[in-house]
């Protein structure tokens, strides 16, 4: 099952291109690590090209709120990511109406950053699993299909077997932040 947060990586890239010109992602990650513990209060509604699931709205637009003159661009970057992750969390909570979600498998461009993965674990309040397998999304779809065909008792069993040859990195939520 997949949910949609429209243009989340595109919004991150846009922000970095416009506010961190000339900096590479390693430098940006370091800024996030340095600022992660800071409570700044900036809020971001990340609807740069509308809102995806669970409350589709093609006319929704992005906004940064709760801003004062002490804010810096780093506060906006952190709030952008938190806004994206909160949108994903709302999708996870929607899925929980149908099945327990004890941990979340993550993949994609933003998962190359340890600090962003930790931010996600903290926002979702769940353990995250990042597979070393670059095609983990395809394996997830295969596990669902094989479970429905009766090959495996559950998607989890299928993923465990299919991804056995790869390594995984786990991120655990900080209970104080979750």
Language-model features and meaning:
Residues 1-178:
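Glycine/Thr-rich phosphate-binding loops that ligate phosphate moieties of nucleotide
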